[in-house]
Curated annotation (Swiss-Prot):
The gene is minC. This is Probable septum site-determining protein MinC. Residues 112-132 have a biased composition (Basic and acidic residues). It comes from the Bacteria. Cell division inhibitor that blocks the formation of polar Z ring septums. Rapidly oscillates between the poles of the cell to destabilize FtsZ filaments that have formed before they mature into polar Z rings. Prevents FtsZ polymerization. Keywords: Cell cycle, Cell division, Septation. The lineage of its organism: Bacteria, Pseudomonadati, Pseudomonadota, Gammaproteobacteria, Pseudomonadales. Signal peptide: none annotated. It comes from Pseudomonas fluorescens (strain Pf0-1).
């Protein structure tokens, strides 16, 4: 009687890289009614193009003054016009949290500008503008525990907390963030794009850490061998590096 190899030893899948054409809808205002009307007009021009088209919702260019986005409502508007949301691109903590809550993948903010679909003529590249010199402000020092639901922002400088940070608390700084106690909330350094900003904490147990819009959430951080230790977090390219203090 001949022996055959069990079928479950044969590979049933392959992982392959692929460059897919995916439309990016870059939201400039949080106005679902206007979006609904403007999408309807756009779809009327090329209905076949928008039929079941895969979509990335880019929320990373929304001005800070805009309120929280109703992400399920936004996806519903897009779906009504044939656009199927695969993921979002975001930098604001409220948008990231909304996506995680409904199990939508979150992509990091893009440093490149996408070509608008309606643009047919080549555009001459603009000369890069020299960024304005940052205004140095005194370091903001917090000496009491930061409770859940609190948000503390150090505008134009560093933020130092010499106590604990509870889950649900949020620290933001244009510069560095130092936490001399357990860091269990969210820490966002370099919120205006300073890629040289760093995060220092004596005990990394954070819900989220972010530098210049590049972030890791607790699910990723828990897998890091530095979880629960004193660490320094820095940004190299698009990668957050976590090393022991």
């Amino acid at each position: 009687m001949s022996q055959t190899e069990p079928k479950d030893q044969d590979p049933v899948f392959q992982l392959k890289g692929s460059m897919l054409a995916i439309t990016v809808l870059e939201l400039s205002r949080n106005d679902l009614d206007s979006l609904d009307r403007q999408l309807a007009a756009k779809v009327a021009q090329a209905p076949n193009f928008f039929s079941n088209a895969p979509l990335v919702l880019a929320l990373d260019k929304l001005p800070p003054s805009e309120g929280a986005v109703d992400l399920p409502g936004l996806m519903r508007v897009c779906r009504q016009h044939g656009l199927r949301t695969l993921a979002i691109r975001a930098s604001r903590i409220e948008d990231i949290a909304a996506a995680i809550a409904i199990d939508i993948p979150v992509l990091p903010p893009s440093g490149a500008r996408e070509r608008p679909l309606e643009s047919a003529e080549p555009v001459a590249p603009k000369k890069p503008e020299k960024p304005p010199e940052p205004t140095v402000k005194p370091t903001r020092v917090i000496t009491t525990p930061v409770r859940g639901g609190q948000q503390i922002y150090a505008q134009g400088g560093d933020l130092v907390v010499v106590s604990s940070v509870s889950p649900g608390a949020e620290l933001l700084a244009d510069g560095n963030i130092h936490v001399y106690g357990p860091m269990r909330g969210r820490a966002l350094a370099g919120v205006k794009g300073d890629t040289k900003a760093r995060i220092f904490c004596q005990q990394l147990s954070a819900e989220l850490i972010s530098i210049a819009g590049h972030y890791k959430v607790s699910e990723d951080l828990r897998r890091d061998p530095m979880w629960g230790s004193g660490v320094q977090v820095s940004l190299s390219g698009d990668v957050l590096n976590i090393i022991r203090l």
